[in-house]
């Protein structure tokens, strides 16, 4: 009862909000491996559109210019996909939610097929795609994760990523632009 009242009061005062944790993986911290995971491969727009699993195929629009996509297959069947954005595409589409410097990219989306959830597919894909991005010269990778999505936190943390910030956007009094507040959580950018 009190929780619902508090939520209503917060919405009245702050308007719509977003709350994301920012995760970071530096190239030096990327998991070292002599052998890449053979089940994680780069994938392009055409490959994504051809996927049989609609939960994965419907995210094909995330691929393209300034995007690097990877697909994890389990027993020969695509189980998860992820997309890193950088450059102009990231700046244009994300409203610079988290600023990126050169040689930095943001993991914009990761999707796991419902049949593969709870089996470590996301963790494997996050870890291996980060390793491959680092090997390709990307120095720092970021991702934003909704504040209450515990399964995503766990996947990133098991993959070796560190939570570095909390970003809140609030829109008090229905302003034209929301206020964005960034709180560091113990690691410099």
Regions found by a protein language model. Name each.
Residues 1-59:
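Acyl-donor-binding surface of acyltransferase catalytic domains
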Residues 109-112, 118-135, 140, 154-158:
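Conserved acetyl-CoA-binding loop-helix of GNAT-fold acetyltransferases
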Residues 147-165:
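Conserved active-site alpha-helix within GNAT-family acetyltransferase domains
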Residues 143-152, 171-174:
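Conserved beta-strand-loop-alpha-helix junction that forms the acyl-donor binding cleft
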Residues 18-23, 162-176:
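Conserved catalytic-core motifs of GNAT/GCN5-like acyltransferases
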Residues 51-77:
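Extracellular-facing segments of soluble proteins and assemblies that are Gly/Ser/Thr-biased and enriched
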Residues 65-66, 73-105:
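Conserved acyl-donor/pantetheine-binding loop and adjacent beta-alpha core of acyl/acetyltransferases
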Residues 71, 106, 111:
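Conserved beta-strand segments that form the floor/walls of ligand-binding pockets within enzyme
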């Amino acid at each position: 009862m009190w929780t619902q009242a508090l939520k209503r009061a917060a919405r009245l005062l702050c308007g719509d909000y977003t709350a994301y944790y920012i995760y970071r993986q530096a190239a030096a911290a990327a998991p070292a491996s002599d052998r890449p995971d053979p089940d994680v491969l780069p994938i392009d727009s055409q490959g994504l559109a051809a996927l049989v699993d609609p939960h994965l195929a419907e995210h094909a629009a995330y691929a393209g210019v300034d995007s690097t996509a990877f697909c994890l297959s389990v027993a020969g069947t695509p189980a998860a996909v992820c997309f890193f954005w950088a450059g102009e595409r990231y700046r244009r589409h994300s409203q610079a939610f988290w600023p990126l410097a050169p040689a930095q990219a943001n993991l914009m989306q990761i999707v796991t097929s419902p049949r593969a959830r709870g089996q470590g597919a996301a963790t494997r894909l996050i870890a291996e795609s980060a390793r491959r991005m680092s090997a390709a010269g990307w120095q720092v990778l970021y991702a934003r994760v909704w504040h209450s999505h515990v399964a995503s936190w766990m996947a990133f943390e098991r993959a070796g990523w560190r939570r570095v910030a909390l970003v809140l956007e609030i829109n008090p009094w229905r302003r034209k632009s929301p206020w964005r507040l960034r709180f560091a959580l113990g690691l410099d950018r």
